[in-house]
Amino acid sequence: MLSRTVPRCVKYGSTPKDIRYGMEARNALLAGVENLVKAVGVTLGPKGRNVILEMPYACPKITKDGVTVAKSIEFEDSFENLGANLVRQVAGLTNDNAGDGTTTATVLSGAIFKEGFRSVASGTNPMDLKRGIDLACREVLISLAEQSRPVTSKSEITQVAMISANMDQEIGSLIGDAMQQVGKDGVITTQEGRSLNTELELVEGMSFERGYTSPYFVTNTKAQRCELENALVYVANRKLTSVAHILPALNYAIQQKRPLLVIAEDVEGEAMHTFLYNKIQGRISGCAVKAPGFGDMRINQLQDIAVFTGSQMISEDLGLSLDQNDFSERFLGTCRKVTVSRDECILMEGGGSAIAVEERVQMIKDMISAEDHEYNRERLVERLAKLSGGVAVIKVGGASEVEINEKKDRIIDALNATRAAVSEGILAGGGTGLLMASLRLESISKDRRLPPDIRTGVNIVKKAIGLPARYIANNAGVEGSVVAGKVLARKDPSFGYNAQTGEYVNMFEAGIIDPMKVVKSAVVNACSVAGMMITTEAAVVEKDLLGREKRIEDEGMEDKEKKRSVDKLRKQVNEAGRTDAQDGAADEV
């Protein structure tokens, strides 16, 4: 039975806080930052080490992915955890923007905060220090742009993927082949295979740049994606706002015991509440996605989706309304697999007729030939690529679940790095690009026209951006400062250290390259978050009443005064519990 939502009012009570100020606050933040950076930093470079993570209710996970390590670390001390959370934010932002470079971003933010903290402790003005950090960040980006080169060949694409996958030639070749088959803007996705070997398969599919309308639709919490199998597809060229707009499709999907994908101009109000409530209650699995494009472009793209999935687009222009009496199961299409992330929807093996899809493709080709306007032609070419390009699926194989998950993490990193390289070009890898950028900051840090505290901020960034190269060398068993000194002495943006072989080489010729977008995102996010941390003067966390009670009892404090403290704490906890229960009962009423 389909259920509708009932408006509820939820009350939230305040909790006691712990506050620390000045040096005490920054010391606690720094402790959390340093411990997190130490754990993440060991994974950097081709000879970086793995980290083994305890997983609740599952076997341990072995990974070399910086953001995975960062997200798994929690500290008992709330203030230390506060600092670690800020660095985790840097890793997360970099991962969202570029899909890779999380370890570099973590190392940079930790170094900038640590040196900035020391400077503030010695009397430097924190606001001027941040201005210097921001100035240095802009100059580093200029230097990186001057060093970057476009990606022009399949071999360069393969090399970028191989480096990001920890020098795995097989993964590099698979991603190079996948991009060759579906194009640089094509869709490449991963899934767990059923054999020992990792394989590449090209399937019918299309994608568009729109994500889920609510995080409550997420089914894979680790990847933050909604994944649906054998889904029904409902396409509408209008806003769905009332229950009547979505009820017929929901009822049919529940009867068929199949998930439902809704693609419409928007899904809001009662329609969204009803869909979400029944999803949360477990009556139906599904997802709502906004339609791509605007105006006539949106109508055309919705029609492309309808043809691919075998659905009929609901549009009043076509004489089709959303009235219950007009609904028919023929309006719904099908799709073998749907993957929806925060900003992309991928449809694989739609239920549309192959003849209808081919006719649609030919129609778009004819429109491209007849179109004179460059902008319109580009949009038509995009539609053609999405409808006819297919989806490359990398099926990850392995002997165990641990091996498959570890390899899948590396493939996803390699895919993201490769896409970043294609979009914004490449730099010499191994931290060489950032070392060369530090030379640009050398002259700025000596500019006497700048206030001393701003120059100090520039110097902090100059020192920090040399650390990735040092970490890579240290993890390879070589003295990092010696390697950095030799590379800087050459002042050649293509000259660097190959940590895999222990040789100094031309990084581009050796295929040791980093995507410009990845390095840029790491620098920008690290400078932004670390700069804000330096200017922190107070830190506020919630008091742990239950934890304090346990500590007092464990220490065997038996005098009356301390027993009264325990009783008081118990009373506070019990009152808080009763208040929550009363609020919950009120909400149910």
UniProtKB/Swiss-Prot annotation:
Pfam families: Cpn60_TCP1
UniProt subcellular location: Mitochondrion matrix
Primary subcellular site in the record, as a coarse category: mitochondrion
Entry keywords, A to Z: ATP-binding, Chaperone, Mitochondrion, Nucleotide-binding, Stress response, Transit peptide
SUPFAM superfamilies: GroEL apical domain-like, GroEL equatorial domain-like, GroEL-intermediate domain like
Induction line: By heat shock.
Keyword Electron transport annotated: no
GO biological-process terms attached to the record: protein refolding
GO CC terms, sorted: mitochondrial matrix
Region (Disordered): 550-589
Matching InterPro entries: Cpn60/GroEL, Cpn60/GroEL/TCP-1, GroEL-like_apical_dom_sf, GROEL-like_equatorial_sf, TCP-1-like_intermed_sf
Function statement: Implicated in mitochondrial protein import and macromolecular assembly. May facilitate the correct folding of imported proteins. May also prevent misfolding and promote the refolding and proper assembly of unfolded polypeptides generated under stress conditions in the mitochondrial matrix.
Family under the similarity heading: Belongs to the chaperonin (HSP60) family.
NCBIfam families noted in UniProt: GroEL (TIGR02348), PRK00013.1 (NF000592), PRK12849.1 (NF009487), PRK12850.1 (NF009488), PRK12851.1 (NF009489)
Name listed for the protein in its UniProt record: Chaperonin HSP60, mitochondrial
Organism: Leishmania major
Gene coding for it: HSP60
